[in-house]
């Protein structure tokens, strides 16, 4: 039996994409603002690394639990929307609060204040993002429609990376704010209100199917906690046995988190290598690195990757796009040139294929592996559990990347308090900036060599599931 696939209305795709913009803008703004912790609040590299690492460890623990809860929620609103709503509100309130930092409170107080509120913020992000991502996985059963949904979501979400780098310019501009600390406190309020409004859109405007009387769902109660725990563990075991899904997680871990380890170095390389530590002279060049890269991803990478995927298949498109990104990383070594800051812009088109291609394809491919899980293990479907485990890999890796960033800066001898860096410090940062993500990407390409869900197999699985569900009904 050939399964019937319903095309998702463009309005629904856009509503989903607005949630993606919020999900990307909150962390993007956080990354920009965190430079202020080093530059203006005096956080040393190790403290900076811990601020990155510890909240994300907590986040990585809570993600799979949230996935299980969402997958098994019985509600007339469905399994996703109410959590998206609550998570959006919690993120918004906490983001404003965590950035109300004042230098006169002292380094130790500011460190603990920010660390504790970061944990709460990431809890809100978990409550929002896990059911939100699952909502996207279950919007369509069609192999290519899934890619189109994620492509539109990523296209909208990429605007976060176009907009947010300009926050550097705003908070360091004396005509806007008296100090970067003041700029961060104020800008955090506007960013939070905007992102919270976007995050609420999927909860309010994407219709959910009632799960109130779904007997396939596990009962989540404190009285049933033992059964609930073992059902949760079984979901993890099922995911771990799903070899294509494990390959997606591993590839994402190596690509995204090797990139995350060196991402903040772009600011330091531009300011301290191209402009000898003069942030004022660096002007908008750090901003252009992020903003132009995001624009290229939005208007070049995502359309090309989406089209290639329909013609060549998702796996082959993944391999090609990641190979292109390695060329981009290598070009950065040659194109960061003091006195010619514009040269690094020529590396950005190829560099942008890495992350831009990764999430456009991987979120679609994860939905395909959820079908495989239903084929092998039956109902309930585990979109949120799979999404949570996938993003657990991303977030745990990001936590590790944050810690590694601080350790690498310490290892090479980088000191943000110095204008001119010690001999070898900038060379060390530049070597890591090129070599570290290139190695991570090569490992991911090797891992994906044996990924085996192509369009033909995906359609075969969908047909079997459609026939099975018809018989059940």
Q: Where in this protein do the model-derived segments appear?
A:
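Membrane-embedded alpha-helical bundles of multi-pass transporters/translocases
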Residues: 2-473
